[in-house]
């Protein structure tokens, strides 16, 4: 595609600073809901008199709800107003935080966490809203890198803050902190962002939403159950997977018949959809449980690993990993504006594959320094490059007439890949004598498949119905 139209002018700081403040506040609010609670789980067990399994279920409920809401809320924003939907998400999430903060028992806490899951598609919706107000491609790529890197980068810091709050004021203070930030986000988004919708705004395809949500919910639950390995109810896993397959089949058939589908079948058949979603799914499956499970576990293993204490391991692995992604994300965005999103994605994937090769050899000499090196390396290549580009491609590949479907489904692929990663890599790890190395080798093989699939993702500049292409013709 070529165009003689000049590049749109960059926004001035007086325009993009308030916009970024609003969007980053919303991203902060969501990320606190997702990760700030992690170090407070033991405190919650004590204060509520609950079991580890019961508290774990509330976490699973939050992430499952976040995945399901991500499927359709971005598209609903296309139709009724993106700012309206984001403000509503933050408001409802604040109510969920309050419900969790005052919960007298685990049952009420579970309901509160499900309500908080409404904030699930915050990042893709923020990126779509950013796309509407920042028309200059280079400036958009840089700001996209900032938004997405902040989303992952604060995960290592807010967990520390959550642990401090829970230790000094009880776990309920963590939820009150979340509620306050959600309330601030409501005001900031309403005041500092502009409302936008798709050019055409037909009725929402709720008939398509239902089977898709059932399908993804069943598959996610099946993977969570499978992740229990020896304790898993495998009959339940099979039933859930069958229901999930039936749900996807029903969704496909509904989309072929309705006048205004959630996702037109023509889009589902295009490489921008299935190649991107497959790459996201395989990338997450290959790396997520390595960085969030195998490497921290290896670090704490007194026999086969480094024997680092539970209170210290995050400082050696997850925190530097997240901070490396935070620092490098904006650089990746700038690189994408110069070299192209797909090329930078593949650079990140090659680097992540290299990081897993290093990790495989590192298993033989585990110590704090090797763990720190691998964590920073993967923080740059995956969290700072590949993850940023996968999120960005979901935005820049979307057709101008349906900007919400691909980011929403991509968010579902991220969540599905995270669940599948723990189920597959931990199953492999538990099946071999040298379990840590076996799990990492499995992740390495899956990442190679993701890299191969990434070559099927079309370059955004080769598609003539994206927002950038439409703007270029104006």
Predicted segment positions?
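Helix-breaking motifs and short loop linkers at transmembrane-helix boundaries and internal kinks
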Residues: 47-49, 81, 101-108, 170, ...
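12-transmembrane solute porter fold
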Residues: 16-31, 37-39, 52, 235, ...
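Extracellular/periplasmic helix-loop-helix junction of adjacent transmembrane segments
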Residues: 38-68, 106, 308-317
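Cytoplasmic helix-loop-helix junction between adjacent transmembrane helices
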Residues: 114-149
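Paired small-residue
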Residues: 92, 96-99, 107-116, 369-377
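Central cavity-lining transmembrane alpha-helices of secondary-active solute carriers
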Residues: 60-74, 124-128, 319-331
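Hydrophobic transmembrane-helix bundles of small-molecule transporters
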Residues: 167-279
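Conserved MFS/SLC helix-loop-helix module at the cytosolic interface between two early adjacent transmembrane helices
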Residues: 67-104
